[in-house]
Each structure stands twice: as C-alpha cells, then as structure tokens.
A protein has these predicted regions:
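N-terminal ligand-binding lobe of clamshell/alpha-beta domains
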Residues: 1-305
Length: 305
C-alpha cells in the first residue's frame, strides 16, 4: 500500500471510486471524503467566502497578474505526511495546485513521485483513472471502474434517444459571464443537451450578453466553478436586473437548473456520471426534488414541452 497525498479533488474522487481511500494520507481543503474519514488538509484558499462573483473574479485576476497562487499549500505539512505519491492537477492554476507550485517540495524530496492529471474530455478522464490504477498496481480495479462508468454513460445516451434534443447554454461563471468548456459540453450531449456557445474540449470562455440573447437557448444550466448550487442561485438573484435575464426564454419559462459547480462539473473524475444521472432524472421527472430551482419569479420545473 502506498501513501498517497491528493492535491487534486478529482484525484481524490478517483481514489475513492477505486476503493483506495485508505491509501490517502492527506487532501486539499476542497476535497470531499466519505463519512467517517478525516484526513489532514494541506491547502487553503485566499478567496474570502463573503466575496461576490465580481469580487472573486477580480481577486483571481489580481493574484494571477502578480504570480501569486490563489490556492496555497503547506510545504511542512506535506513533508510531515511522508507521501510516496502526490496527485496534482495540471489544468487550471486559478482553481488549485499545479506541478509548478510543488517544484521546491519535489526537489527537496526526490524520493516522492508525482502524477499530474489533466483530462480534457471523457475519454481522457477514463485514461487518467486507468493510469492511476496501474501506477498503484491496481489495474483490475481501474479497468472494472472504467467499464462500469462507460456502461452508465451509454445508458444515459440510450435514454436521451427517446426524447427531443434541447438547445442549451451552460454558464461556469456569472459576473462576468463565462461559458462551460472541456468535458462538460461533451457529457451534457449524452443526456440530449446541445451546447450553443461552446465547443467540446475547449477551455471555458467569456460570453457576450448580446450573443447569449441572440442564441436564446431552450434551457440554461448554471454550474459556477467552486460554488455549490445554492450559492450559484444566490449570485444569480444578486446580479439579476429586472427585465434583463427575463429576456431569455429559458429564464422566463423557468427552464434553468443550478448545479453544484464545486462537487460536480468542475472535477474531471468518476462522479461526473452521478451528476449527469441527476440531470437526466431532472429532465424526465415530474418531481422537483433534488433540484435547485430558479428565482421566485421564474420558479417552474423544466418540463418536456
């Protein structure tokens, strides 16, 4: 058994899905662990939780321009955990620890191996799981997990063939407006949601308000990076001006879904399928349970109309 330190929430999710959570010796402040498991958290975030969307965006840009990471790690705590392997993401320096941030730690402890995870689509997510399983000498567990995830995804595709496709726009941030990218667009297509303002595999991108109005999607999905569904809904209500958002057909008709952008689509890991299954149930169910709905003025469930 190896001592694994995960500095990537998606990597932590992979360890848990592989049944190897007992191998973990430490995680980030962002990681979610199974009930009853407590581990040292070796990172912290410089973002004040009281900041609104605009303030958070300004802070992140300021930190990046000065070369200061938004997420900070505790080098002494990492060394004290004596990891054999460190998992780290290599997609976004604004969201977490990247390999460059660990240069001094790894140089000081050359016996420690590191694995950078940077999947940009569903196939690369599965490849990352397989690679991690082989690295930890648990290839059969990884192969089994990959097979089960693919079977679940295919069932969603089959389900979606029984209903009309919907034109959708996904938002990763609200102020300023940013559209979804990477793996999310591809996965949403599996449940019949066709993104109108982004391309699968591409990075998240700024969205022009006029362009959003022009597209006028059938439904709107809000999954703000790092924010849960309730916080995303609060931000939506805060920045919504009378008549502005309501010009969108999706909002006017209540065809809007707030998603957990922290535990959900911001993590390229195995639990993306769970989130996708929740959306599939929401698209086909008459019950509003487990759904964070739109503001009071537009509070209606998304129907099949």
């Amino acid at each position: 058994m190896q001592r694994v330190l995960s500095l990537d929430p998606a990597g932590t999710d992979m360890m848990i899905a592989l049944g190897l959570e007992s191998w973990l010796v430490g995680v980030t402040h962002q990681c979610d662990l199974p009930e009853g498991i407590e581990l040292p958290r070796v990172t912290r975030c410089s973002i004040d939780r009281s900041m609104d969307s605009r303030q958070i965006d300004d802070h992140v840009r300021q930190q990046q321009s000065s070369g200061t990471p938004v997420v900070l790690h505790d080098s002494e705590a990492i060394a004290a955990l004596r990891p054999d392997l460190i998992l780290v993401q290599d997609l976004c320096s604004a969201c977490g620890i990247i390999p460059q941030h660990l240069r001094l730690v790894l140089e000081s402890h050359p016996q420690v191996e590191s694995m950078a995870l940077a999947p940009r689509d569903w196939s690369e997510i599965l490849e990352s799981i397989d690679r991690l399983g082989h690295c930890l000498e648990q290839p059969k567990q990884a192969e089994s997990l990959v097979r089960r995830l693919e079977e679940r995804r295919q069932r969603l595709v089959d389900n979606s063939m029984q209903r009309p496709k919907r034109r959708s726009v996904g938002l990763e941030w609200l102020e300023p407006l940013y559209g979804i990218g990477h793996w999310t667009i591809e996965l949403l297509k599996n449940v019949g949601l066709i993104e109108q303002l982004g391309e699968a595999g591409e990075k998240s991108h700024p969205i022009d308000w006029n362009r959003l109005m022009e597209v006028d999607p059938d439904c709107l999905l809000v999954a703000c990076c790092g924010l849960d569904a309730n916080r995303a809904q609060e931000e939506f209500q805060r920045i919504s001006k009378p008549g502005q958002w309501l010009k969108l057909r999706a909002v006017e008709m209540g065809k809007i879904l707030f998603l957990d952008g922290n535990r959900g689509f911001s993590r390229p890991g195995p639990f993306l399928i769970d989130r996708l299954e929740e959306i599939d149930r929401w698209l086909t169910s008459d019950s509003p349970q487990r759904v964070a709905m739109a503001p009071e003025a537009t509070r209606q469930k998304l129907s099949n109309r």
